[in-house]
């Protein structure tokens, strides 16, 4: 994972269908320019303005490019659950802030059998990051609200929480194939799928 923080995830939630369509076209063309032209012209993003289509495409491309070639190739045979989990993985790999929120807050709660995320959990996390991350120091209240709103929508659409209202934690169910793809990439990302250290060691013994 890149050590820098990127907050442009506010431009697009999980966008499961749209991201999958982009990946399919990229695997067909093997060329980002051709993929972009198709996606914009066919309005895969389902946005009225061309500028909005381009903005969302840039964000989805950034996410897709974070995946390994092996992970991308697996989309050809992946189940709907695998597709969702791999697209969520792309988000975790792209946005350090989201990854850290899950590992530093959600995983700790989950391991303590506390299965509901409170607004105060997020607010405490955000405050702890606000003065450590340059991009957050002088953001507006509106941007701060949107960062939170879109983050929880991503978690909901990833089926990581039951809803943005209740925020009950749901541990993702990963296929053996996806577990192996993550382990061969970077086993640390399994933490964001709520794997314990013990479970991660077992995965490493099996696949690495």
Segments (PLM) and residue ranges:
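Short, solvent-exposed secondary-structure capping/transition elements
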Residues: 69-73, 110-115, 133-136
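Short capping segments at the starts of secondary-structure elements
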Residues: 30, 114-117
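Eukaryotic partner-binding/assembly regions in large regulatory complexes
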Residues: 1-85
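Amphipathic alpha-helical interaction surfaces
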Residues: 63-66, 104, 108, 128-132, ...
